[in-house]
Amino acid sequence: MATFAKPENALKRAEELITVGQKQEALQALHDLITSRRYRAWQKTLERIMFKYVELCVDMRRGRFAKDGLIQYRIVCQQVNINSLEEVIKHFMHLATERAELARNQAQALEEALDVEDLEADKRPEDLMLSYVSGEKGKDRSDRELVTPWFKFLWETYRTVLEILRNNSRLEALYAMTAHRAFQFCKQYKRTTEFRRLCEIIRNHLANLNKYRDQRDRPDLSAPESLQLYLDTRFEQLKVATELGLWQEAFRSIEDIYGLMCMVKKTPKASLMVVYYGKLTEIFWMSSNHLYHAYAWLKLFSLQKSFNKNLSQKDLQLIASSVVLAALSVPPYDQSYGASHLELENEKERSLRVANLIGFEVEPKAENRVALSRSSLLSELVSKGVMSCVTQEVKDLYHLLENEFLPLDLALKVQPVLSKISKLGGKLSSVSSVPEVQLSQYVPALEKLATLRLLQQVSQVYQTIQIDNISKMIPFFDFTVIEKISVDAVRRNFLAIKVDHMKGLSSLVNRVLRRKDSGIICLFLAESLSKARTMIYPPAKKAAKLGEALSNLAEIVEKEHKRLLARKSIIEKRKEEQERLLLEMERVEETKRRDVQKMTEEAEQKRIAAEYEQRRNQRILKEIEDRELEEAQALLHEAEKRSKRKKKPVLEGEKMTKKVIMELALNEQLRERQEMEKKLLKFAKSMDHLERAKREEAAPLIESAFKQRLAEEAALHEREQQQEIELSRQRHAGDLEEKRRLARMLENKRILQEKVVSSREAEFTRMKRERQERISQIIQSRKQEREARRKMIFFLRSEEERQKRLQEEEEARKREEAERRKKEEAERQAKLDEIAEKQRRRMLELEEKEKREREEILRKSTAVLPKPAEPPTLGRPAELGGAAPIPAAAATAPTPGPGKYVPKHLRTKMDGAGQAPPPETDKWGGGSKPDDRPSWRDERKPPSFGSGSRTSWPASRR
């Protein structure tokens, strides 16, 4: 570690190293200087050193070095010159951003260069293997190596700066600016993973701010400037999350904003709240939570109407229409029906959380909470006057879906209204904080609601209905979609329907109608019948004469007297009932008064206990503050005692606070440190002079000692050289003697070597031959196994193909059999239809024949009798023959005696009347036209009367 007397020397040394290309050594030198304890007093030179330091860190992509240096520099200048730290950090981020942009501009394929899932993750083994196998040596790989590292370094830069600036009241603005730039980085380059981590980092910083409340320079969220900075950061986070499509992170951002507002107990400006509710509508719409989406729209409408006075009538109409359509899009049944107890509890907690996010007010008691529901939302729309601001199409749609009872043509009337609504919407004016409103997004949900309403109304009128008729009545969807909607409604206990696809019918299971539903049906039925009666029987004109008006005066007076007596008794009963109700109300009021008194007493006791607890806490805090003040004063006295100036400590009694005393102590310590550094610099300078003088005096002595040492070492070297030569001669003579001694055994060694080599060669040949035989056997056995396996596979495949062929033949035979049966059934049905048609024609011929015979009989009777008479009543004809003719002798029958029955036509003849009597009229006033229809009927058809079931829908249509 190099030591420099002055910081300027370190800066010069670093520049020299950079000039010769040794950037790593220059960075290390500056790092040692910055992290050294000698330079803890801020000076302008340190700022220049930090600029050079961050430039080297950016050039070499050393994020860890940059973080360590910035932390040390923050310690140095935090109490002296915080603006210097801001300038260094801004320069650092500017350099990192500039280098990242430069690398991005150099890359020609940005899409491939940025295709990295996580900037903090290393390369996976699979990616490395794929790159080596595929030989990725071209431009794509160079782009990855060029662009991705710089974006990774830029992301590390943002993280480092946020970590350094966190929870510091003097650096709040720079912290907010860095967070905004980090959000824009994630938004510009679609970095979803880094955005989630960034949100978590900011969330942890706020949690630590609330956790460590006694730290120095802690931001005060109750200050308007600090609160506005934090809120702006959170709203920017919310906007970027919605633009990136991270809806879960956007919802967590909403919770962060709500928690921040609850923490400081302040509501932001109306412009921010409009953005808040606008993003809530998008989040709830994407999560298919239509109820909360509608409530958020209602809050947004209230804000726009209350605070935005420049809003045009058209924009207000579109926003109000969105509110009503969002409310209508809410499913009309309970989504949590059939859930378990645990799921219901979780849903209650979730609903409570969302209600707090939407309304910012929560009832403390659970029994007093009003649950968010579709009915309460619609009633609130009416009470707040939203319906008066919507377009006429939306009003018509609301009336059709919520007030009308049209079980047959509801969907047909709703469809053109939805077509008009889908064309409404568009961009709003710049005055409105809502950029765009599209009403067409609600059309699918409204079509589903219209389908549910139609099925509900049909189920209240009919028992069965054909599937084809349902499809014709609902033009929005196919029957598969209608069936899916019906199944969901049945699962939620909204409908009770059974679908029989074999018969093509939909059975609407009988249910006991609720009083409300039956009342609505009866009301519509009464109105329809009243209109029909008025059309058939118009009201008669009032009598003009006074006598006609007073004809029943006595009866009217009697009725009026009875009515007055009944009214008097009713009034007496009502008075008694009212007195009883008053007594009951007094008892209830007394009970309530006692409960309120009891609750007041309990609240008073709680208040007294809370005040006592508060006083006790204040006393404890006062004791802690006094003790800390004493410790700080003692520290200040001790610092003054250590000081050489013997300055009297500044104490003003109760006016001195802990913060002031701590600042005095810190200033004193800083002054002592600076004086100590000056002394050390002076001492280092004197030591340099002393060392230089010592070395000048010691230089001649060292030179003479060196020459003497050279002479001694030369003599020693010559002596050791002679000794080594003598020893070498002695070793050579010994080696020659040893060679002569071993030369006589050379022949024996050769014989033994040949013997061993021959035996080893024979053994090697044998083992090689055995190995070859073993390999041949293994190869032969494997060939046999392979052949057997191939035969088995061939056999299995052949068998499988045979089975498949048999199966296909069987299926073809079954299809032919089914087609043959279907054809025979069609032929049989055609024959039956032909037989039925022939029988119908024969019956028509019989009727015509019978009619002609009847007319022939009438003509004969008219020709015989001088006066017309009523034709006789015909009996039932035979199965296949006509009616028997009446004999003509009956016309000239003699006059019977008294007491005998005489037919009517004979009595007419005997009386000799000039004209025939008029025909009798039935009691219904049907006229004198005789009934020419035959009195027989087809025995094959069941009678059309006497059925106890309700009329089905197709029958009523006929």
UniProtKB/Swiss-Prot annotation:
Residues 93-123, 548-696, 796-861 form a coiled coil. Residues 316-513 form the PCI domain. Residues 946-958 have a biased composition (Polar residues). Residues 804-859, 929-942 have a biased composition (Basic and acidic residues). GO terms for molecular function: mRNA binding; translation initiation factor activity. Residues 877-894 have a biased composition (Low complexity). This is Eukaryotic translation initiation factor 3 subunit A. It comes from Nicotiana tabacum.
